[in-house]
Amino acid sequence: MVSSPVASRIDAVSRFAREHGWHLMFQDRLGSGHPFDWVGDGVVATIRDDRRQLAYLRHLASLGIPIVDMTCDRPDFPCARVSCNHVEAGRLAAGHFLERNYRSLVFFTIDWGNGRERFWRGFSSAGSPGKWVFSAECPNARWNDWGAVSNWLERKFASAPKPLGALTYSQAESVLLLSAARRLGIRVPEDLGIVSGGEDKALLECQPVPITAVDMDMGRGAYEAAELLQRLMDGEAAPARAVEFPPRRIIARRSTDATVASDKLVRAAIELFASGLKSGVNVESAARALGVSRNTLNRRISAELGRTASAELQRQRLMMAKRLLADPKNKVEYVARMAGFSSASHLGSALRADCGLTPMSFRM
């Protein structure tokens, strides 16, 4: 396995190796000591732009060793591929922002390439987002010069519309974006919503504002890559096209925990919905607390958000439930009660209607 040390990928390939009696070796793709004298039966890899890794993999391919790539970044490298559908991932992120009423969107990345282009294609299908590509605007700067990237981001923020929804290609880019925003006093998520194009729970949950991510289901991809490699080692011909699978879901965290609204009454209603879930707030009681009729509240919310007041309240309940379900210590009954559902079965029905998952499968 020649890859960056992503735990979900390593765990999945290791599981397949145990199940099928493989002798698995791991080589960091960025390492300098690639073992050119190694002669094995097959390789699963994450193929990027590192010259040493490419030279090593070309050497292995010249020996007739089958290779399965777990990314879509280097389609020019001749090998079998299994990767997440990046176009669908970009589209999923755009839908997440639009559901929260972020109308100005931007895609931020340090560099460009096939995977990023596919993310952008899906993201831009929802409208006309901006594109911030550091390497295109600062071609003489190093991609890992975080000071230069940060200064450039501050200049971009100065002229950007707000509220702004920003999708990044990688976890590291989302953390950098959050850091630059905090230095400028830009509120996240009120003025800037952030979605990372990759999930890394350990990194994204420890941020001052935990960052929402697209779950690219890398564990599934790695396991399917190992399955394909086994078939290639058994003599099966490589598929003519890359094997793609859909992104699993959006993992919502605080960086997009807002519904953008210009109407003060709508903002107040959203805040009331969110704060009153545990106490059983409904549209009628919210309208009464805000001093307007139910019809007025429904009309104003529909005009601002494009959905009814009841639909927005249900969305707030589901957002709360999903956040609580992310912690395995929270029992489903507790989650249902805190999110304003009448029972665990009521929550289960709502979650299945929303994303096709039960509370237990949502946690997996």
Predicted regions mapped to residue ranges:
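Bacterial carbohydrate/catabolite-sensing allosteric modules
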Residues: 1-47, 51-289, 298, 315, ...
